[in-house]
């Protein structure tokens, strides 16, 4: 973990990442200054746009880099024929899996923390509080843990790093774009059925994707959008979701959507981590929870 954080590759990634953010921030500040000179007005929304842009870049980075970092963590050891050696040590299997995940999380944490100075520019004119930053970091942390646990799971189950990486990305795409596609299809089918006995206006008000809408609770992109929209947007995700997926009901889940989604995603991550530990366990478990024998996989 320490060696990786001091590598030239890590420094290059930090340099490129922060150079892009700094360039965007400078361009944003320049456009605000030019607008003041021209119209004598300050568009404070541009600072919120900068905050949204930086946060979105971090989210996309977590969504697609974390699976790549973790998908080869266990399968790579198996390919180098060092996994059996690690299994003979006194290290707990849980600690080994969590250590692999933590190593990747630290890399992403360094990138996220390095972007704080650019995000802090929004504090100059207000609109975002420290509580908002904390909520954003919590959302990013859950996304990183979930996508990282997906990579760890496939890395433990599959023998080849290439296959585990592909499966990890397919799962991430299924959680994000897949849940949206399923809900969009269900809403279109419900809308077509409603049009057969109601006017177009009433049909659009009645139709919805039904219970499938709750699949969005496992969608990291929807969770992030809900958080960032509440901080720098309208604060109501229904304005964007209802025209695409139908009416969302008023209940305890929709009222606390962000909390419910983050909790469920953490539970899913824990299940995947537990499954990864089980997958690399050499032998069967006895009633005390310890493995018997040294059955090589």
Walk through the language-model features, giving the residues of each.
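Hydrophobic residues within alpha-helical transmembrane segments
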Residues: 16, 102, 106, 110, ...
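Long, hydrophobic alpha-helical segments
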Residues: 50-76, 80
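Hydrophobic/aromatic residues in alpha-helical transmembrane segments
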Residues: 66-70, 118, 149-150, 276
